[in-house]
Swiss-Prot record:
Pathway: Carbohydrate degradation; L-rhamnose degradation; glycerone phosphate from L-rhamnose: step 2/3
Positions of the catalytic residues: D237
GO molecular function, one term: ATP binding
Keywords assigned: ATP-binding, Disulfide bond, Kinase, Magnesium, Nucleotide-binding, Rhamnose metabolism, Transferase
Protein's organism: Escherichia coli O127:H6 (strain E2348/69 / EPEC)
Source organism superkingdom: Bacteria
GO terms for cellular component: cytosol
Binding positions for substrate per the UniProt entry: G83, H236, D237, T238, N296
Protein name: Rhamnulokinase
Record carries keyword Transcription regulation: no
E.C. numbers: 2.7.1.5
Gene it is expressed from: rhaB
Length: 489
């Protein structure tokens, strides 16, 4: 039997994990084992919302050392994280300034300024990336305007996963899938766009040319002295999650469900027409030259904040209580900027309902019901937008990531979208990370080959849409009202 041992470091906005994958070549089986799990979260430092990258690095090294202490010879390591955020370094590799998080308010108003000065359509034609107020282009503009004293000291800007790879190997890399989330990469050249960089205030010398997934960045020397390759995987966690989505055919869509919900489809070509611009569709880079045509949805961030504020520890009990409530009494737009990082999420949700003359969700279950129903309805709207964009309906939706364990939300999604939902795998980002490592090690041929492995080894659950559910009737009523308005226009 031939085995490969690959380690995935998968960092999310609320937690991180070091996972060991064991791949058996002869039977093409893949097993995962959690080695180390640790918390991540936002911190307040010198007036900014930041990440504690030192704590994260310590946790990563602890997890890697645990694997080595078991006597396991690691064949490769890969790191994936969230997008858009970065760490600045001087010429000696020391940090400059703070690792500010995307939920910080320093970028307020800058996206509108960019659209006015450069032209919204021109930015979109160059980058193909959706307009989000915290994209790296606006973060860099905020930095250069608000902290000009830092500029002379900056020699390099590394996105978060590239920073941790650098800390392990001493080698710098700018991985393509994550680089595209910055809104600074030209969609035609796959290199940094000089016009967009100039507006951001950043120096092009801070960046190296983006590299596609599948190359070895450098080596980490383990405590036992072995040199272990660190692979540039699809380092944006959604890109890794999509790689592990067992998409079957061109009519399959995906929903990577976690702190954020990312809904989209794979395409060999980007969509940058006026329809895509109007819908704020993004064309993020994927593996093998594919595009992740998708839309960001605020996701379970709202629930995470409610759980924190209400000190709720028993999530299954909350979901059971939520399921007993009638649907669609409290509806908000989860993508409203007011929910990016409010002082109090519960109060913000209640205020949104009050301002739209709805009943006010008061208790824990009502707040959760509001979030789940609102997300499911937004999923239905986005899926419809995506189908219209490409001119073909979808036949199934694959929900992957930690959020796919929420069976109530999965069923609400199936009912609201009127589509078969396949939930799993849960550890999609980790698996996609491992998939690129196995391809780099010449164990697998390509992404489609890896998806066959995932389909046979992952635990998948199917949710069939119920047209008689409350939320399905609500969606039908909305569509009927919309059609009436269009006919009368």
């Amino acid at each position: 039997m031939t085995f490969r041992n690959c380690v995935a470091v998968d960092l999310g906005a609320s937690s991180g994990r070091v996972m060991l994958a064991r791949y058996e070549r002869e039977c093409r089986s893949l097993t995962l084992r959690e080695i180390h799990r640790f918390n991540n979260g936002l911190h307040s430092q010198n007036g900014y919302v930041t990440w504690n990258v030192d704590s994260l690095e310590s946790a990563i090294r602890l997890g890697l050392n645990k694997v080595c202490e078991e006597g396991i010879r690691i064949d490769s390591i890969g790191i994936d994280t969230w997008g858009v955020d970065f760490v600045l370094l001087d010429q000696h590799g020391q940090r400059v300034g703070l690792p500010v998080a995307y939920r910080d308010s320093r970028t307020n108003g800058l996206m509108a300024q960019a659209q006015q000065q450069l032209g919204k359509r021109d930015i979109y034609q160059r980058s193909g990336i959706q307009f989000l107020p915290f994209n790296t282009i606006y973060q860099l503009r905020a930095l250069t305007e608000q902290q000009p004293e830092l500029i002379p000291h900056i020699a390099h800007a590394l996105l978060i996963p590239d920073y941790f790879s650098y800390r392990l190997t001493g080698k710098m890399n700018w991985e393509y899938t994550n680089a595209t989330t910055t809104q600074l990469v030209n969609i035609n050249s796959d290199d940094w766009d000089e016009s967009l960089l100039a507006w951001s205030g950043a120096n092009k010398a801070w960046f190296g040319r983006p590299t596609h997934p599948g190359n070895v960045i450098g080596h980490w020397i383990c405590p036992q002295g072995n040199e272990i390759p660190v692979v540039a995987v699809a380092s944006h966690d959604t890109a890794s999650a999509v790689i592990a989505s067992p998409l079957n055919g061109s009519r399959a869509a995906y929903l990577s469900s976690g702190t954020w919900s990312l809904m989209g489809f794979e395409s060999q070509t980007p969509f940058t027409n006026d329809t895509a611009l109007a819908a704020n569709i993004t064309n993020e880079g994927g593996a093998e030259g594919r595009y992740r045509v998708l839309k960001n949805i605020m996701g379970l961030w709202l629930l995470q904040r409610v759980l924190q504020e209400r000190q709720i520890n028993d999530l299954p009990a909350l979901i059971a209580a939520t399921q007993a409530l009638p649907a669609c009494r409290f509806i908000i737009n989860p993508n409203d900027d007011r929910f990016i990082n409010p002082d109090e999420m519960c109060s913000e949700i209640q205020a949104a309902c009050r301002e739209t003359a709805q009943p006010i969700p008061e208790n824990d279950a009502e707040l959760a019901r509001c979030i789940f129903d609102s997300l499911a309805l937004l999923y239905a709207d986005v899926l419809h937008e995506l189908a219209q964009l490409r001119g073909e309906d979808f036949s199934q939706l694959h929900i992957v990531g930690g959020g796919c364990q929420n069976t109530l939300l999965n069923q609400l999604c199936a009912d609201a979208c009127g589509i078969r939902v396949i939930a799993g795998p849960v550890e999609a980002s980790t698996l996609g990370n491992i998939g690129i490592q196995l391809m780099t090690l010449d164990e697998l041929n390509n992404v489609d080959d890896f998806r066959q492995v995932v389909s046979t080894t992952a635990n998948l659950t199917t949710f069939t849409p119920n047209p008689d559910s409350e939320i399905a009737h609500y969606v039908a009523q909305i569509h009927s009202t919309r059609q009436t308005k269009e006919l009368c226009a």
